[in-house]
Amino acid sequence: MAPLKNWDNKTWLSSKKYINSFNRFLLKQIKLNKNSRILDIGCGRGKILDDLSNKLKLLNKPIGLDIENHKDKSKKIIFKKIDALSYVSKTTITFDLILIKQTIHLLKKKQAIKLLSICKNKLNPNGKIIILSLDPNKNEIPTFQLMNKKLNISLKKDEKLFNLILKNQNKFVIKKFTFDVKISK
């Protein structure tokens, strides 16, 4: 079976309402300004970064990493088609915010721990790493049967990883972002 490309391009994940809601939540978690440096791991098309860049009038183009090279990616970001560990290990840039969105479950446990460790060393003073993942216990994403099975496996993996992170890192805090998805037939 061929991989699903652009599956989310016209869904709620790409809607202005979702992006605005997410960025409002994000800006309550961390103080950013026009001089902030932002890295987004799993940026997709860069729509969240694009909106954030506009809101903050960023002087430094945010950097977005993704393993898919989307045709319709934002022009307001520096997009790199590369895996996160490779990029973060080599970059000399430090960041005020490192976002890891819906990607941590794609890594093996050791890779995820290594990525977080390297990311911590790439933060400016007062910088933050924010990991976005679905709540394994409270989500109601409508999916077809095979996708639902894979989603549940990913969510269980995320939950184990978050428990491991919280056990080993006293600086991590969990905050909940919720967004009500309205789907009509």
What do the predicted segments below correspond to?
Residues 1-30, 45-77, 81-87, 130-185:
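Class I (Rossmann-like) S-adenosyl-L-methionine-dependent methyltransferase catalytic domain
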Residues 36-44:
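Conserved class I S-adenosyl-L-methionine
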Residues 87-93:
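Short amphipathic alpha-helix with an adjacent loop that forms part of the alpha/beta core around
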Residues 99:
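A conserved beta-strand element that flanks and buttresses the S-adenosyl-L-methionine
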Residues 102-103:
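Short catalytic micro-motifs in class I SAM-dependent methyltransferases
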